């Protein structure tokens, strides 16, 4: 299956990636400290920059009953490019337990 996905997504450039930002705790969105709020403001500023650059299509929190998480849809060249974008996010660099899961979209309707 991985080989199939690699071939399918390699054929399209730029490619679209579904990036899921998993916060450090399930209730994070409801229990932010002032320091975490400032970090989230830096995160939002970073995402706005990606939107201006044309690398981000949409982003926002998802109301998952198990706990909110962040959705980021990127349109970049490769999965390595998507990883570089997510690794550049202030929340990912913060060392506070945020992590991204990145999956290529097999197709998109835009």
Each predicted region: which residue ranges?
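Conserved, structured core segments of small domains
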Residues: 1-110
